[in-house]
């Protein structure tokens, strides 16, 4: 095997490992990172009542749209970051829109599971809280 092939394989493995580590760090921080062409991770798993931060690293202003029940939705402008708390278990889809209409809309989902400790979420909001604003279904 040539040295170039070995270096190429090693570089590929290193890049793959780096991407996996970045995804693990984001999940450990309860963060979803908005990049120019993708969400990291696109499917985020959390627990009901946990705070999830959406971090904008795209270099552009974006709007995060939380898709609600029966077509209801709310959109929030994000220059740096926003946070949300999901008060109901289940799938919570969202979209990220860029200010440039030529940019592709990014789609993701937050999966909120019931708290296994059984402590529950002592909330007053039935669905979703974004930056201290209750979004009702």
State where each predicted segment sits:
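Bacterial N-terminal signal peptides
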Residues: 8-18
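Bacterial Sec-dependent signal peptides at the C-terminal "C-region" and cleavage site
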Residues: 17-27
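N-terminal edge beta-strand
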Residues: 25-49
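Non-cytosolic beta-sheet module surface loops
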Residues: 36, 55-58, 98
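Histidine- and aromatic-enriched segments that form or immediately flank copper-ligand environments
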Residues: 59-78, 104-110
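Extracellular/periplasmic metallocenter environments
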Residues: 77-137
